[in-house]
């Protein structure tokens, strides 16, 4: 549900692979099942409360970009979940760099998708937020990954992985 502080909410993709990546991302997002967390087939449960649901929904509605998918309540919720605070996973694009969704933590199933042309632009975009708890760098070029890890301003940075960690390690 994007309600942990290590969730990535800004997806930066090299422009040369953006069309293929976007197609695969949207297909994977469409396959996610939102619903009853007690059911094994559910990928995303509800948001924590009505005020939080309204905050996330308002952030989506106020975003000056394009909603590629999601943004609403799922239509196929089981009866026992109909009054819950469920939200479809949402991906937005065409956002200005200075909008709230690019600069603030939303803590919901919301992500922005943005292209970058080269490594310096990727680095600039990655560091263009006061929130830098975690980041993930995905690339076939390990030299590039190590260069970026040295310059991205984040406390935890994964290379070609996410949420792989030792829970005994100090954090925060």
Language model: regions and residue ranges:
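ALDH superfamily catalytic-core signature
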Residues: 1-96, 125, 159
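Conserved C-terminal structural/oligomerization subdomain of aldehyde/semialdehyde dehydrogenase
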Residues: 33, 79-82, 86-172
